[in-house]
Regions:
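N-terminal ligand-binding lobe of clamshell/alpha-beta domains
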Residues: 1-275
Length: 275
């Protein structure tokens, strides 16, 4: 009788977005990676060590096939065409579509399972959960909570996605556009009328323009925005999109830490409001 085949875990993985690359490095499974996105910034060494095969919505399909991956990891509807092309070529593809903190943690669990290392994934998840809990505990001590407006894009104006909204709340802020944060697609988070932001009266403005350099003058010169407390008091900040707009370890560590620092400093300066 023939023996049943044993599982063969992927050894030649291509990551089309940054978060799976970073997760594999943190799990010390980076030896499996043979290709990455050209937009990968974390960890920095990945840019030196791995072949770049894609942008965000485009990929070098011939190069990917040449590398002979046994698994390609993709993300979201934005990479649907890339995924379709690879599947037609017989490539094994797993496409994640996580948009919240809990889904991001589950992504790590799933990823670790795909490579036969579930305990490493659980360890990383536990560390990330512990970090978030610590930040949340500190935020609970803040004397006052600011209203935070997070801008993901400037023209049209697009507000923060789900996990960003959750991180703002964990860090001690109140997301001005919680109702938009539930929308996974950017087109459904467009603020059609910029005066709506004025009506929200945010205390803090945070920009993360998805890879574009932040232009403070462009923001403060918007019609009527001088009436916004955040603009009036120069509580205007930028968080690098690499640190917050990738739904992976970066957002749950460095990203939320930057939010917490901005919010806690504001709360300290404005603690008289709570008296």
């Amino acid at each position: 009788m023939n023996q049943l085949p044993h599982p063969k875990w992927p050894e030649r993985i291509i990551c089309l977005t940054e978060e799976t690359t970073e997760a594999l490095y943190l799990m010390e499974e980076d030896h499996r990676i043979i290709g990455i996105s050209a937009y990968t910034m974390r960890p920095e060494r990945a840019r030196r060590e791995k072949t770049k095969v894609s942008a965000y919505i485009t990929a070098r399909t011939e190069k990917i096939l040449e590398l002979k991956p046994d698994l390609v990891l993709a993300f979201s509807d934005m990479q649907a065409d890339i995924v379709a092309d690879l599947i037609k070529e017989g490539v094994q593809v797993h496409c994640f579509n996580h948009r919240s903190i809990s889904e991001t943690l589950q992504m790590i669990r799933t990823l670790s399972g795909l490579i036969g290392q579930p305990e490493k994934g659980e360890k990383l998840v536990t560390e990330l959960q512990s970090n978030l809990a610590s930040i949340q505990q500190q935020a609970a001590k803040l004397p006052v909570r600011p209203k935070v407006y997070f801008e993901e894009w400037f023209d049209p104006i697009i507000t923060g996605i789900g996990w960003v909204s959750e991180l703002i709340e964990i860090a001690g802020g109140i997301d001005c556009y919680q109702e938009f944060a539930k929308q996974s697609l950017a087109k459904n988070r467009i603020v059609a009328d910029a005066s709506d932001v004025i009506a929200k009266q945010p205390d803090i403005y945070i920009a993360s323009w998805c890879g574009r350099k932040f232009d403070k003058e462009k923001v403060i010169s918007r019609d009527g925005w001088q009436e916004i407390p955040a603009i009036k008091n120069d509580d205007i900040y930028e968080v690098n999109s690499t640190d917050i707009l990738q739904p992976g370890p970066a957002a749950l560590t460095d990203g939320v830490a930057q939010l917490a620092n901005i919010i806690s400093q504001w709360a300290e300066r404005n603690k008289k409001q709570s008296n």
